[in-house]
Amino acid sequence: MLAIEGGLHEDAALIEACALLHDIGKLDVPPEIISKPGKLTPAEFEAVKAHARFGAQRIHDAIRLLEVAEITALLHHEKWDGAGYEGLVGENIHLFARIIAVADVADALLSERVYRARWSLSDTLAYMQAESGKHFDPQWIEVLMRCEDKLKNMYEGEEK
């Protein structure tokens, strides 16, 4: 409201988002200090003041996450052989996107969907293996195959 009233129409949404995060550093201050009804001791006040630095650090740490999340959101439909949305090939596809592509497709196949039944673990792993070197980075398919028992434990409750 203030940003718009002050003529900052283009920045209003960004300012609103920043307003939601400005006190995130209070998560690092003990709750008994944050909610103390009386006067703070000097040490408690120093802890409250530190929330600004804590918040800045949390946001700084999130920057890498957002940078990589942007890349993986764009590239998770790339295929090892270049047949993906952006046409990148092999190791030109960001490592994290290659890993997420394997996990995303395996999870999609192993999960019930409104338009189809879930696949069995053996069918899923056979499909993933068949797509190694085409759709998926072969290295990460090998890793997926090593996770068969873990996948069985994760998805066994969903077997019908």
Region spans (language model):
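Histidine- and acidic-residue-rich, metal-dependent catalytic cores
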Residues: 1-160
